[in-house]
Regions:
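Conserved acidic/glycine
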Residues: 1-48, 54, 243, 247, ...
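Cofactor-binding active-site loop characterized by glycine-rich and histidine/acidic residues
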Residues: 24-28, 34-164, 182-188, 193, ...
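A general secondary-structure junction signal
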Residues: 66, 237-239, 319
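Short acidic, gly/pro-rich beta-turn/loop elements at beta-sheet edges
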Residues: 72-74, 180, 245, 314
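Glycine-rich ThDP/TPP pyrophosphate-binding loop and its adjacent helix/strand module
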Residues: 109-306
């Protein structure tokens, strides 16, 4: 049994519920034609995001990828602002200019998602260099998928971070597929984290990325190592996305049996059972959290739908840094 504090465990449950319910609601809005642009969902990957994020300090920084909804929520984005952003509204966290694939929240330390595969890696290295030069004590976490590790920028970013001993964690959420390509057909190493050896930095493997406690405890060790001035770490967490690569992907390259097998490893249900069986929380407590999250998600939709679209003159706003 874990020795983690009850409040932390309940926060894990709440955050994962927020990710699941927000993404399923956004998927409904996509089908209604209310969401401009492409969307990529984090359903099934909740533990891999939440366990990592709760191991950080609130003022630590992250860079995200195209599948950034879960990371944004886990980092503490305002749900109203997020939903408004995804619907392209002026009240969104990026004033409707970012949308789903470029969701960002600088107030929460989220430097932004990125529509380019691996695009956040160089940004993370720059942010980590900034923290090192200013001696802030903050660290940076770069989120990316398994497919991004075959991009040239992966080598460039990890190599530079290792040379300069930067306070950055490279975090690969391995869901097994780069769009429709099985990762086993795309790389010759058994596990992504083994690539750390080429750069002389530690590699960490979280085998069950659907166990939020395992993710948290593993990630916390890496956070303490990096914050201690020891340089970067490469972490791999194995999980699975329940939905297609994007809102336009029917997922025909996977069998129903494979998807159902992973659904039996539901990270939220796993934590719910753990909390109840170990008498950490009652079913009623968890149901109350679920009800409040559902209410907050519905409120975010109402806020977003009632918000205005950006005025034409806003196209000339935020071009330069103040």
């Amino acid at each position: 049994m874990s020795t983690l504090d009850k409040n932390l465990l309940l926060e894990m449950f709440r955050k994962m519920e927020e990710i699941r319910r927000m993404d399923l609601k956004i998927a409904q809005l996509v089908k209604k034609g209310k969401v401009p642009g492409m969307t990529h969902f984090s359903v099934g990957e909740e533990a891999a995001n939440v366990g990592a994020m709760l191991a950080l300090n609130p003022d630590d920084l992250i860079t995200s990828n195209h599948r950034g909804h879960g990371q944004a929520i886990a980092k503490g984005i305002d749900l109203n602002g997020m939903m408004a952003e995804i619907l392209g509204k002026y009240t969104g966290t990026c004033k409707g200019k970012g949308g789903s694939m470029h969701i960002a929240d600088l107030d929460a330390g989220n430097l932004g998602a990125n529509g380019i595969v691996g695009g956040g890696m160089g940004i993370a290295v720059g942010a980590a260099l900034s923290q090192q030069m200013q001696n802030t004590g903050k660290i940076v976490v770069c989120f990316f998928g398994d497919g991004a590790t075959n991009e040239g920028v992966f080598h460039e970013a990890v190599n530079m971070a290792s040379i300069w001993n930067l306070p950055v964690i490279f975090y690969c959420i391995n869901n097994g597929y780069g769009i429709s390509a099985d990762i086993k057909k795309m790389t010759n190493v058994e596990h992504i984290h083994q690539r750390s050896a080429a750069y002389g930095i530690p590699g960490m493997f979280i085998e069950d990325g659907n166990n939020v406690i395992d993710v948290y405890e593993g990630f916390k060790k890496a956070v303490d190592y990096v914050r201690g001035g020891n340089g970067p770490v490469l972490i791999e967490s194995v999980t699975y996305r329940w939905l297609g690569h994007s809102s336009s992907d029917p997922g025909k390259y996977r069998t129903r049996e494979e998807v159902e097998l992973w659904k039996q490893k539901d990270p939220i249900e796993n934590l719910r059972k753990y909390l109840i069986e170990n008498t950490i929380a009652s079913a009623e407590e968890l149901e109350e959290i679920q009800a409040k999250v559902k209410e907050a998600v519905e409120a975010s939709v109402k806020f977003a739908e009632e918000s205005p679209f950006p005025p034409l003159e806003s196209a000339f706003e935020d071009i330069y840094a103040d």
